[in-house]
């Protein structure tokens, strides 16, 4: 007992606050350990260019996740979710069971099957912000903050945000500090926390 009291007092002696500093959670960004060989990631892990795909650094563990991509330069691109088994060198994604993506033509693909499509008059253009919600069942697309009512589903397992580019496309990712307020109940990606 005396040892435990001494331990507690030791934290407070010499004007100490008794607080133990907590580690700051890392920021979610594009993961250079999980990207295609011809992909270039810049702007502190927030911009993708080159050719190929890249996963984000954190999986979608919470029930309702939201993230955004801003189209800086048009070309061939796709955004959505994927497992770590996806081939990030083989684009377009959405051709197998390991990815569910919306492509630049507005089609949502999973397992080489078109699951849904944006209205023809609502295709994302340069400067637009595309938001993605995912609730472990359904992926939904938002264009400049507006729900496109274009759900798609089918992917299983632990998924990560994914983006791919080709043909001079440049996209910026936002995993926090969003351009548009997430829909009710959805929030930024949270790192899974472990307490030892």
Swiss-Prot record:
The lineage of its organism: Eukaryota, Metazoa, Chordata, Craniata, Vertebrata. It comes from the Eukaryota. Transmembrane segments: none annotated. The modification N-acetylalanine is found at residue 2. Keywords: Acetylation. Pfam families: SPRY (PF00622). CDD domains: SPRYD7. Gene3D superfamilies: 2.60.120.920. It comes from Bos taurus (Bovine). Residues 2-184 form the B30.2/SPRY domain. This is SPRY domain-containing protein 7.
